[in-house]
Swiss-Prot record:
Gene: HSP60
Identification of the protein by name: Chaperonin CPN60, mitochondrial
CDD domains for the chain: GroEL (cd03344)
Primary role: Implicated in mitochondrial protein import and macromolecular assembly. May facilitate the correct folding of imported proteins. May also prevent misfolding and promote the refolding and proper assembly of unfolded polypeptides generated under stress conditions in the mitochondrial matrix.
Subcellular location: Mitochondrion
Family in the record: Belongs to the chaperonin (HSP60) family.
A single GO molecular function term of this UniProt record: ATP-dependent protein folding chaperone
InterPro entries xrefs: Cpn60/GroEL, Cpn60/GroEL/TCP-1, GroEL-like_apical_dom_sf, GROEL-like_equatorial_sf, TCP-1-like_intermed_sf
Length: 569
């Protein structure tokens, strides 16, 4: 079948392409970016406003999370939607890398694109202006590094988390306590609670540095994770290519009506396709994960997981053969398994605690016998995974809407706190970017730059003042007055406390941002804005008119069941 036929059968059809060039293309894209930014920017700061989002099913969603607002927006005009999609992608990228800063990146991208568009219409070279923007970003990043301060104490961790949770002290304290319990590099997850209160629980858990083989296994579209409970775990020291290799296992879990996690060297070809089809059709709750590590280290880690979950590693070299003889006792078990793109977390494995302790003692003994720094690193890594608990923040609330909104804030706060631990903190409330604008004043006067490049520098200088202005505006203040006062005093740690409506030392007041979040927001925003400024043509699909309602399709009899296992395969 040709490509058009395939698309049509998937419910998508178009009647050709629509193209806009130059100013016409940029005007339309800018309109979409402006509208998206306006909706997102109202959430910025401690007094940011709520946004209500209609849901396809159930009650409307109420949120102050910038990336959630951005994801919900889609315009009828396809060219406006192009611009919105590009900025929405920036927000997603910023969120994935730094865990926060999505609203800041959206505001910055909108300003850089808007000011850049005006400059281009007045005759500025978009290419030279883009070079100026890139130079300005480098200078701002250097300034942010100089302003940053290493985060050390539990109090500082709590402050960062509180700010990212829109001033919720309870969430900040929970995250600070969680990091104290499992360490700054420890595993912390967020889940739905069963009470009105938000609680912290530290459970026995193990994390692996590998995620799902295919995104089709995802069960939670929002978090892009596979979340399953009471799961059997099959550990395979080989590649699984055909479904026949694991058919007895699938028959067993289908009868038991339990989910299955397969951790193997790889799962591909027919086996992967069959698992995905049956998962999508609701016949199996399953997820395939590639085994972590390489060589002997991979083998050892599989055995570590086996001991933690109470299972065995399937290895044909030891005479095992699932097709001829399957013993369900080789399967491990865990109360909960959470699988992301790059990480798998196994909670409450069914392994014998005594066996786990013996395994840890064995690894410690091996540590004392090796002189290889590489082997020591891998042994320490295995020991940490077996020893480390997992902190679970259980979010409670009076309704699903309240729990959902609170989970957004907890996740944002957790991600921002991790970013703060990795690269330090800077004055919050937009102050760090505001003070970086002083360094750009010097760059804008650099005689080696062309006038068009200087225009690019001035655009960034204007844009990085806007987050501070927006935060003050959302709190009911005069943004221009506040930033003028701060720049005039030139006290690099001074800022405006929008919650209290007064000027304070931001570090002392605990109003701080992770340096990584601010840097990532700026880099991503400047990148996409620069691309839109230099865009000379935009192409979209012209949707085909909806077909008239008619009768059912003749000649399509019922689809026959697939043989074996009651139509599963």
């Amino acid at each position: 079948m040709n490509r058009a036929g395939v698309l049509a059968r998937r419910g998508y059809s178009s009647k050709g392409k629509d193209i806009l060039f130059g100013v016409d293309a940029r005007v339309k894209m800018l309109a979409g970016v402006n509208r998206l930014s306006q909706a997102v920017s109202v959430t910025l700061g401690p007094k940011g406003r709520n946004v209500v989002i209609e849901q396809p099913f159930g009650a409307p969603k109420i949120t102050k999370d910038g990336v959630t607002v951005a994801k919900a927006i889609e315009f009828k005009d396809s060219f406006e939607n192009l611009g919105a999609q590009l900025v929405r992608q920036v927000a997603n990228t910023t969120n994935e890398i730094a865990g926060d800063g999505t609203t800041t990146s959206t505001v910055l991208a909108n300003t850089i694109f808007s000011e850049g568009y005006k400059a281009v219409t007045q005759g500025t070279s978009p290419v030279d202006m883009k070079r100026g923007i890139d130079r300005a970003v480098e200078v701002v990043l250097q300034s942010l590094t100089e302003q940053s301060k290493t985060i050390v104490s539990k109090e500082e961790v709590t402050q960062v988390a509180t700010i990212s949770a829109n001033g919720d002290v309870e969430i900040g304290q929970l995250i600070g306590h969680a990091m104290e319990k499992v360490g700054k590099a420890g595993v912390i997850t967020v889940s739905d609670g069963k009470t009105l209160d938000t609680e912290l629980e530290v459970v026995e858990g193990m994390s692996l540095d590998r995620g799902y083989i295919s995104p089709y296994f995802v069960t939670n579209a929002k978090t892009q994770k596979v979340e399953i409970e009471d799961a059997f775990i099959l550990l395979c020291q080989k590649k699984v290519s055909t479904i026949q290799q694991i058919l007895p296992v699938l028959e067993h879990i289908a009868k038991a009506n339990r989910p299955l996690v397969i951790i193997a060297d790889d799962v591909d070809s027919e086996a992967l396709a069959t698992l995905i089809i049956n998962k999508i059709n609701g016949k199996l709750k399953v997820c395939a994960v590639k085994a972590p590590g390489f060589g002997d280290n991979k083998t050892n880690m599989l055995h570590d997981v086996a001991i933690f979950t109470g299972g065995e590693v399937y290895n044909e070299e030891l005479g095992m053969n699932l097709e001829q003889h399957f013993d369900h006792r080789i399967l491990g078990f865990a109360k909960k398994v959470s699988v992301g793109k790059d990480q798998t977390i196994i909670l409450n494995g069914a392994g014998d605690p005594k066996a786990v302790e013996e395994r840890k003692e064995l690894i410690q003994g091996m540590l004392g016998k090796t002189d290889s720094s590489y082997e020591k690193e891998k042994l320490n890594e295995r020991l940490a995974k077996l020893s480390g608990g997992v902190a679970v923040i259980k979010v409670g609330g009076a309704s699903d809407v309240e729990v959902g909104e609170k989970k957004d804030r907890v996740t944002d706060a957790l991600n921002a706190t991790r970013a703060a631990v990795s690269e330090g903190i800077v004055p919050g409330g937009g102050a760090a970017l505001l003070y970086a604008s002083s360094a750009l004043a010097e760059l804008a006067a650099d005689p080696t730059l062309t006038e068009d490049q200087k225009t690019g520098v001035r655009i960034v200088m204007s844009a990085i003042k806007l987050p501070a202005i927006t935060i003050v505006k959302n709190a009911g203040g005069e943004g221009a007055v506040v930033i003028h006062q701060l720049l005039a005093e030139k006290k690099m740690q001074q800022g405006y406390d929008a919650q209290q409506g007064k000027y304070v030392n931001m570090f002392e007041a605990g109003i701080i941002d992770p340096a990584k979040v601010v840097k990532t927001a700026l880099v991503d925003a400047a990148s996409v804005a620069g691309l839109m400024i230099t865009t000379e043509a935009a192409i979209t699909d012209i949707p085909a008119p909806a077909p008239a309602a008619g009768g059912g399709m003749d000649g399509m009899g019922g689809m026959g069941g697939m043989g074996g296992m009651g139509g599963m395969y």
